[in-house]
């Protein structure tokens, strides 16, 4: 979904949102129409805004593997019809030591102003993104298997983050019956949040990464801060990160949510 080495997010904007799921794949044949709770919403509860599509999400479904067929679309199906070339971020680097998968996995995270979901980067996209940020693969002992594991961990971190956001958003289920969707997100690895700095002063470690996720709550933009902490050894589900997810204190509503949850945790 994102494309930075730490835990990826790029918000390059574009206007082409014509990507469609791979043909013949049952998982993408149906499309949700409207709000599942209220099919003809009125008023602010299901208000929609128009958001531009991040470049790395364009044509993303062309690389999503169909679980029935077991293989991704290849060759001509993946070429840009305008120049018969694959998208640049799926092109192997000139000195790349081994081949990497271009298959992309669909997330469970709804994309704002769309019936589609966000799609995670492929191994090749992740590799290219790291190179672009100055990473030197020759300085690392890295293999194809390592890249596979990196993608699995990255995807699991994002799924875990969204689950935590949904817990907070449950406080607003009445005002937003359609549920939230993700507009954009970005990494701020070295911009430690006040909460992280206070924890550090108390003797705890600083997070190894930070993301800010901007969600659409039925017409209202809400920012969430996510601090990523090392949780030790990676388990079989590729989970090793401890996430501290909470709404940013950008509004009285967010302050009230934080106060309520803090009280519940204190008294439970």
Curated annotation (Swiss-Prot):
Keywords: Disease variant, Heme, Iron, Lipoprotein, Lyase, Membrane, Metal-binding, Microphthalmia, Mitochondrion, Mitochondrion inner membrane, Myristate, Repeat. Its EC number is 4.4.1.17. It is found in: Mitochondrion inner membrane; Membrane. It is a lipid-anchor. GO terms for molecular function: heme binding; holocytochrome-c synthase activity; metal ion binding. HRM repeats lie at residues 24-29, 34-39. The keyword Phosphoprotein does not apply. It holds the Pfam family Cyto_heme_lyase. Lyase that catalyzes the covalent linking of the heme group to the cytochrome C apoprotein to produce the mature functional cytochrome. It is linked to Linear skin defects with multiple congenital anomalies 1: A disorder characterized by dermal, ocular, neurological and cardiac abnormalities. LSDMCA1 main features are unilateral or bilateral microphthalmia, linear skin defects in affected females, and in utero lethality for males. Skin defects are limited to the face and neck, consisting of areas of aplastic skin that heal with age to form hyperpigmented areas. It comes from Homo sapiens (Human). Residues 1-25 are annotated as: Disordered. InterPro entries: Holocyt_c/c1_synthase. A lipid is attached at residue 2 (N-myristoyl glycine). Belongs to the cytochrome c-type heme lyase family. The keyword Repeat applies. This is Holocytochrome c-type synthase. GO terms for biological process: animal organ morphogenesis; cytochrome c-heme linkage; respiratory electron transport chain. GO terms for cellular component: cytosol; membrane; mitochondrial inner membrane; mitochondrion. It catalyses: holo-[cytochrome c] = apo-[cytochrome c] + heme b. Transmembrane segments: none annotated.
């Amino acid at each position: 979904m994102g494309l930075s080495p730490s835990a990826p997010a790029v918000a390059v904007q574009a206007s082409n949102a014509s990507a469609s799921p791979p043909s013949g794949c049952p998982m993408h044949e149906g499309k949700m129409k409207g709000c599942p709770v209220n099919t003809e919403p009125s008023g602010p509860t299901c208000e929609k805004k128009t958001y531009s599509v991040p470049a790395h999400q364009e044509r993303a479904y062309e690389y999503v593997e169909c679980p029935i067929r077991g293989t991704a679309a290849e060759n001509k199906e993946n070429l840009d019809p305008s120049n018969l070339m694959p998208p640049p971020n799926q092109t192997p680097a000139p000195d790349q030591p081994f081949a990497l998968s271009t298959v992309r996995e669909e997330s469970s995270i709804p994309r704002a102003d769309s019936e589609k979901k966000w799609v995670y980067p492929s191994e090749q996209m992740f590799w290219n993104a790291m190179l672009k940020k100055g990473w030197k693969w020759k300085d690392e002992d890295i293999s194809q298997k390592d890249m596979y594991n990196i993608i699995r961990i990255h995807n699991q971190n994002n799924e875990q983050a969204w689950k935590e956001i949904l817990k907070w958003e449950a406080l607003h289920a009445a005002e937003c019956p359609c549920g939230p969707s993700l507009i954009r997100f970005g990494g701020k690895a070295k911009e430690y949040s006040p909460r992280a700095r206070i924890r550090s002063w108390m003797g705890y470690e600083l997070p190894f990464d930070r993301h800010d996720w901007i969600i659409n709550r039925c017409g209202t933009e809400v920012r969430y801060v996510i601090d990523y902490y090392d949780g030790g050894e990676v388990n079989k589900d590729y989970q090793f990160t401890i996430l501290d997810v909470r709404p940013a204190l950008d509004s009285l509503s967010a302050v009230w949510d934080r106060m309520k949850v803090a009280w519940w945790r204190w008294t439970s």
